[in-house]
Amino acid sequence: YVPLEGDIGLISDGAGTGMLTLDLIRDMGGEAADFCEMGGLTSPEVMYDAMKEVFSGKPGIKSLLVVLIGGFNRMDEMAEGIVRYLREHPVSIPLVVRLCGTMEEEGKTIMKEAGLPVYDDLRTAVADAVRFAAGGE
């Protein structure tokens, strides 16, 4: 976890994915509040802890962007961690989640059943996170 100056929280499951997403956030007029990269094999607990780290790390986050592209990591487990965190710690900011990879459909189902949006396209996800942070609906 590295705190930054902006207002868009960012969680990614790899350094490359995170760096690309940081660039896209800036290219679209936003500023990231952090760089939280989970790296390596993850689990629902690791995802939960990443959410906890971001929300306890810096005040003033206006949207949270979670970008997960899993080969080894299972998207259903990542979704379980996100949903569990939000059930235990409701947040009032928009959440933007992009899931792609192993067990993707199962992960999307878990998110949708919890009433949480899931994005198929990284650029659309980033654009919405930037728009939400700027106060857009």
Model-predicted regions and their roles:
Residues 60-101:
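C-terminal hydrophobic structural anchor segments
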Residues 1-63, 100-137:
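ATP-dependent carboxylate/acyl-activation modules
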